[in-house]
Swiss-Prot record:
The active site is at 473 (proton acceptor). Pathway: Lipid metabolism; fatty acid beta-oxidation. CoA binds at residues 555-567. This is Carnitine O-palmitoyltransferase 1, muscle isoform. It catalyses: (R)-carnitine + hexadecanoyl-CoA = O-hexadecanoyl-(R)-carnitine + CoA. One of its GO terms (molecular function) is carnitine O-palmitoyltransferase activity. It comes from Mus musculus (Mouse). Residues 74-102 are mitochondrial intermembrane.
Length: 772
């Protein structure tokens, strides 16, 4: 096969005349170019490391300081106050021709200038860290900014005015603070008050007070100690104990999905759309490696932590019997592709040159045209990644630790990411309510064996050119993959484009070797393990009810007429909808980010509050005046916004209690309070999907260029998972998941309640689409 010759640099055979070596010049050329490319990347990393290390300074500023010192010395002005002379006296004795007094004086001035420059950088960086520790601006109304906040904003802008690289602010970000135990306990009790009757609340209050007085002080000391030496006192434990140690299937339980633009279509040619998307992703990876991506900034000046972006590509979750492992490679030059039960390896480079979209389209089309059947056991192989983690770890160790199976598995696990060429078509038809839900189901779990759920993300290509992502959760949270996805969709639409016939622009290089088919030798025992995992995954997938819909009456623009945040508006509507659906309040999880702190990930906002419960109960009674309902709504909204701000600034509830629980386990300390808190089910798990993190186009000029967001599976057996995207000024998308096996839940019924709740709250403020 042609690809085999490309992969081998030389061959040799033993003959009666000796050993005959046959060199492949083309293969050696590729190896040489690959080595050159690798060294280029290393040099870029070294350069970026230097530039990042001296931020907010620069090599230019160092040169200015040196020139100022030398110039002042030339003018007989000693700005060093004798330090240059002191440094000169401390230099080793002069040797040879170059050890002249002038040379030593110049060297002393350079050393002095470098010290002054480095001291200035340290001072500016510590000052910036101190400034970024101030979060008072989050709790102020935009129209009532204090003088302190205005001065703070000016100082931050001055210290971060130079164009930053992706990781320039990492060492200037403050550490996540450890809240005080009494504050956390107080906020916890306040959060569960609307969920408990008086007797249950008194019992919980007693447990909390006992914990606060007896057990918590010791646990808190250890946690504070960890916060002093660890970069982030939460993130490593969160990654390990919440994600990597979970033995449940990743599919549905952990992985989540992201949708394509659904209101426009760029092309119907599957291979062409995929060619553009893969090319755009590797362009993004190149920018990531070179740190050319701008860090995400709140208000355009407060940097967010970029740590999670490091493991976006070349990353796989490796199964283990007790805990999984995240394997991240510094480089990968290929993608793994699945189509009709077969696995392929597709190179992304020719030598050191990234393949053009048209070349990638040709490679993917070759796979689509390949008529070869799957090898025995190959078709459902990926079901191992969809089933239990222990079973997959055992099968991997037994059947994939040597030979061609190991080689092929390495090709998948060491790929930049995983690609699947689906045989089904999906699209969003506003007249067909089920179309968006079917598309979401396909992205969430597919047929249980056409996604490699262990990869950092799987790029899914439908037959009609529609795209989607399935993302593993442990390495990063949704805003990170959302940043990549916005870049890909924007680059595909506005920069790469297509010909009139729907193909990628340009002419393909037909001399490229075809994709390499991955060989397998899967014994009968392994096939049984694959089938068992498939049955587990299929039962899980069949039990998921997913209801996705577009809410058309209004969006962010008209919500602002209520003088509240769009997120608070939706969260209160969810509380009203849930009460109408089940007749009771429940523990509600909303994901908030803590990326204003170094290596921060998420915190929980407990959206069911006393204030939101009071509003819901008043709405249910139907006897209150509209003005009273408006007042109750505003109180609930203000409470929600305040809780969200507290969570973002490190004063949340659940991560603190989670870490105290981990410390108690390490110390062997029993805590009935922590055990009960950590076992409480989240019957309503919610998340807002971010958008427009990166400016690729003007949404006002292109209002139909909207993704539909994404979603996840239900967290509790009798609960709902709800994700929503407030997509611009005039519309919203909702993704609701539940389990068919639960008699308490129905995703479509809950979706209808959400629709009505949004309309009812809007009616309180007489908001209609005609008001815009």
């Amino acid at each position: 096969m042609a690809e085999a010759h490309q992969a081998v640099a030389f061959q040799f055979t033993v003959t009666p005349d000796g050993v005959d070596f046959r060199l492949s010049r083309e293969a050696l050329r590729h190896i040489y170019l690959s080595g050159i490319n690798s060294w280029k990347k290393r040099l870029i990393r070294i350069k970026n490391g230097i530039l990042r290390g001296v931020y907010p300074g620069s090599p230019t500023s160092w040169l200015v300081v040196v020139m100022a010192t030398v110039g002042s010395n030339y003018c007989k002005v000693d700005i060093s106050m004798g330090l240059v002379d002191c440094i000169q006296r401390c230099l080793p004795e002069r040797y040879g021709h170059f050890g002249t007094p002038q040379t030593e004086a110049l060297l002393s001035m350079v050393i002095f200038s470098t010290g002054v420059w480095a001291t200035g950088i340290f001072f500016f960086r510590q000052t910036l860290k101190l400034l970024l520790s101030y979060h008072g601006w989050m709790f102020e109304m935009h129209s009532k900014t204090s003088h302190a906040t205005k001065i703070w904003a000016i100082c931050v802008r001055l210290l971060s005015s130079r164009r930053p690289m992706l990781y320039s602010f990492q060492t200037s970000l403050p550490k996540l603070p450890v809240p005080s135990v009494p504050a956390t306990i107080h906020r916890y009790l306040d959060s569960v008050r609307p969920l408990l009757d008086d007797e249950a609340y008194y019992r919980m209050e007693t447990l909390a007070k006992e914990f606060q007085d007896k057990t918590a002080p010791r646990l808190q000391k250890y946690l504070v100690l960890k916060s002093w030496w660890a970069t982030n006192y939460v993130s490593d434990w969160w990654e390990e104990y919440v994600y990597l140690r979970s033995r449940s299937p990743l599919m549905v339980n952990s992985n989540y999905y992201a949708m394509d633009f659904v209101l426009i279509k760029n092309t119907n040619v599957q291979a062409a759309r995929l060619g553009n998307a893969v090319h755009a992703m590797i362009m993004y990876r190149r920018k990531l490696d070179r740190e050319e991506i701008k860090p995400v900034m709140a208000l355009g000046m407060v940097p967010m932590c970029s740590y999670q972006m490091e493991r976006m590509f070349n990353t796989t979750r490796i199964p283990g019997k007790e805990t999984d492992l995240l394997q991240h490679l510094s480089e990968s030059r290929h993608v793994a592709v699945y189509h009709k039960g077969r696995f392929f390896k597709v190179w992304l480079y020719e030598g050191s040159r990234l393949l053009k979209p048209r070349d990638l389209e040709m490679q993917f089309q070759r796979i689509l045209d390949d008529p070869s059947p799957p090898q025995p056991g190959e078709e459902k192989l990926a079901a191992l990644t969809a089933g239990g983690r222990v079973e997959w770890a055992e099968a991997r160790q037994t059947f994939f630790s040597s030979g061609k199976n190991k080689m092929s598995l390495d090709a998948i696990e060491r790929a930049a990411f995983f690609v699947t060429l689906d045989e089904d078509s999906h699209c969003y038809n506003p007249d067909d309510e089920t179309s968006l839900s079917l598309y979401g189901k396909a992205l969430l779990h597919g047929n249980c064996y056409n996604r490699w759920f262990d990869k950092s993300f799987t790029l899914i290509s439908c037959k009609n050119g529609l795209l989607g992502l399935n993302t593993e959760h442990s390495w990063a949270d949704a805003p990170i993959i959302g940043h990549l996805w916005e870049f890909v969709l924007g680059t595909d639409t506005f920069h790469l484009g297509y010909t009139e016939t729907g193909h990628c622009v340009g002419e393909p290089n037909t001399t490229l070797p075809p994709p390499q088919r991955l060989p397998w030798d899967i014994p009968e025992q392994c096939r049984e393990a694959i089938e068992n995992s498939y049955q587990v995954a299929k039962a899980l997938a069949d039990d998921v009810e997913l209801y996705c819909f577009q809410f058309l009456p209004f969006g962010k623009g008209l919500i602002k007429k209520c003088r509240t945040s769009p997120d608070a508006f939706v969260q209160i509507a969810l509380q009203l909808a849930h009460f109408r659906d089940k007749g009771k309040f429940c523990l509600t999880y909303e994901a908030s980010m803590t990326r204003m702190f170094r290596e921060g990930r998420t915190e929980t906002v407990r959206s069911c509050t006393n204030e939101s419960a009071a509003f819901v109960q008043a709405m249910m009674k139907g006897s209150h005046k509209k003005q009273d309902l408006q007042d109750l709504f505003r109180k609930a909204s203000e409470k929600h916004q305040n809780m969200y701000r507290l969570a973002m600034t490190g004063a949340g509830i659940d991560r603190h209690l989670f870490c105290l629980y981990i410390v108690s386990k390490y110390l062997g300390v029993s805590s009935p309070f922590l055990a009960e808190v950590l076992s409480e089910p989240w019957s309503l798990s919610t998340s807002q999907i971010p958008q427009f993190q990166i400016c690729m186009f003007d949404p006002k000029q292109y209002p139909n260029h909207l993704g539909a967001g994404g979603g996840f599976g239900p967290v509790a057996d009798d609960g709902y998972g709800v994700s929503y995207m407030i997509a611009g000024e005039n519309t919203m998308f909702f993704h609701i998941s539940s389990k068919y096996s639960s008699s308490e839940t129905n995703a479509q019924r809950f979706g209808n309640h959400i629709r009505q709740a949004l309309l009812d709250i809007a009616e309180l403020f007489k908001i209609s689409k005609t008001d815009s």
